[in-house]
């Protein structure tokens, strides 16, 4: 059984026991968070009706509330003018472990 959930501005495919990284959530380590479901597949049965999906939710436990993504380096360069600029960015993430799809 797996589900497509809306988490942190993105959609993620999850199963019970999976660990996922999503954009930073306002939750501390050990807390439980709940996500709305966009689709559920249980063997041959696919649930996409809004009325049925409203009854289903995905629960996840926060494993690491201070995770970070990879460092991304941005460079700008203007030819023949001596103008160059370097900048870096590192996205703040939250690591979650899926505990239940119910």
Curated annotation (Swiss-Prot):
Keywords: Ribonucleoprotein, Ribosomal protein, RNA-binding, rRNA-binding. InterPro entries: bL21-like, bL21-like_sf, Ribosomal_bL21, Ribosomal_bL21_CS. GO terms for biological process: translation. One of its GO terms (cellular component) is ribosome. One of its GO terms (molecular function) is structural constituent of ribosome. PROSITE patterns: RIBOSOMAL_L21. It holds the Pfam family Ribosomal_L21p. This protein binds to 23S rRNA in the presence of protein L20. HAMAP family: Ribosomal_bL21 (MF_01363). Part of the 50S ribosomal subunit. Contacts protein L20. PANTHER family: 50S RIBOSOMAL PROTEIN L21 (PTHR21349), LARGE RIBOSOMAL SUBUNIT PROTEIN BL21M (PTHR21349:SF0). NCBIfam families: L21. This is Large ribosomal subunit protein bL21. It comes from Bifidobacterium animalis subsp. lactis (strain AD011). The gene is rplU.
